[in-house]
Design a protein with these regions (language model features):
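Bacterial Sec-dependent N-terminal signal peptides
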Residues: 1-30
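Membrane-proximal, proline-rich intrinsically disordered regions
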Residues: 21-70, 246, 287-288
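Conserved, well-structured interaction surfaces
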Residues: 46-60, 64, 81-156, 174-212
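Short, surface-exposed recognition loops and adjoining beta-strand edges that mediate ligand/DNA contacts
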Residues: 63-79, 162-165, 202-219, 235-288
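Short coil/turn linking the two alpha-helices of tandem helical-hairpin repeats
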Residues: 153-154, 160, 230-239
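Structural transition elements
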Residues: 171-185, 258-262, 267
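TPR/Sel1-like alpha-solenoid repeat signature
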Residues: 221-227
Length: 288
């Protein structure tokens, strides 16, 4: 009899445990929100935008070999940092396509791009925020999306451009596989997005201390100038070493003929940026 009671108690305790496990994985009320609930609230909408910002990296992240790394194409601008272990892996031959530094940027930046696109599509639902605030947020998200594409371009060269609509979570494998766009297509898209943010009239001219780190007109102009400098460089402008880089349909991804006018566009973009930035109180670093 005692054994029978023990069996009943054991069975009951197991049922309680299973029920507890089931409850454990259920959504916590008031914590998880769908898109409609998120963009119905001004606070949650701003938090969503802050999450889009969270993918912006700084160069010191390269101190850990398991973070995104720092193998950039602008060696003459940034140079190698003494703390950057990625450069050591590159020179000793241990860096390859399976390295975290090669894959992390790709997945993380496309996550950021998808979130930025979702924000752009939904921010106007937030009627709690003033129209001017929504416009500013939307332009910030657009500039951020352009920045993430720029980072992908300088790391991987020609990349797929997803477009305005984020890929649905239930997308088929065929929908997920995207052909790469050419270098010129990538540059033109990024430049157009940055100019759209600049021309919107919604961004701050200069973020200032109160909005430090937010996208502003000065940042967009600087990024566009830097983008054009890459575009004009031999790496992307008539690089015959990349002649074999094509899509399956034979589409050439790297321009094979040097276009000298790209240098003119880069120069003009930098002149516009420096003129604007000087008027906003920026100045070149003085080295004595």
């Amino acid at each position: 009899m005692k054994n029978r009671i023990k069996q009943y108690l054991l069975a009951a305790s197991m049922c309680v445990g299973l029920t507890a496990c089931s409850d454990f994985f259920e959504p916590i009320p008031g914590v998880q929100f769908g898109l409609d609930e998120t963009f119905a609230s001004k606070q949650r909408t701003e938090e969503y935008l802050n999450n889009v910002y969270s993918y912006v990296r700084e160069v010191t992240d390269a101190i850990h070999p398991n973070t995104y790394g720092g193998i950039f194409t602008e060696a003459t601008l940034d140079g190698a940092n003494r703390w950057n272990k990625t450069y050591a892996e590159w020179t000793n031959g241990s860096f390859n396509s399976a390295s975290a530094q090669a894959s992390e940027y790709f997945s993380k930046y496309y996550q950021a791009i998808a979130k930025a696109s979702t924000f752009i599509q939904n921010v106007d639902k937030c009627t709690e925020a003033a129209a001017s605030t929504r416009g500013k947020w939307k332009s910030e998200a657009r500039a951020l999306r352009a920045y993430y594409y720029f980072e992908l371009l300088r790391l991987y060269g020609p990349i797929p451009l997803i477009g305005e609509d984020p890929i649905p979570l239930d997308a088929s494998l065929e929908e997920l596989i995207k052909e790469r766009n050419s270098v010129d297509e990538c540059v033109n898209f990024i430049a157009t997005e940055l100019q759209s943010a600049i021309d919107s009239g919604d961004l701050l001219q200069r973020a200032g201390k109160a909005n430090l780190g937010r996208m502003d007109v000065a940042t967009c102009m600087a990024l566009k100038a830097k983008l054009y400098l890459y575009w004009a460089s031999p790496l992307f402008n008539g690089n015959t070493d990349q002649a074999s880089v094509k899509n399956k349909d034979g589409k050439q991804l790297f321009p094979q003929t040097e276009d000298h006018s790209k240098w003119t566009q880069a120069r003009d973009a930098y002149e516009r940026f420096m003129t604007f930035a000087t008027g906003q109180g920026y100045k070149l670093t003085e080295v004595y």
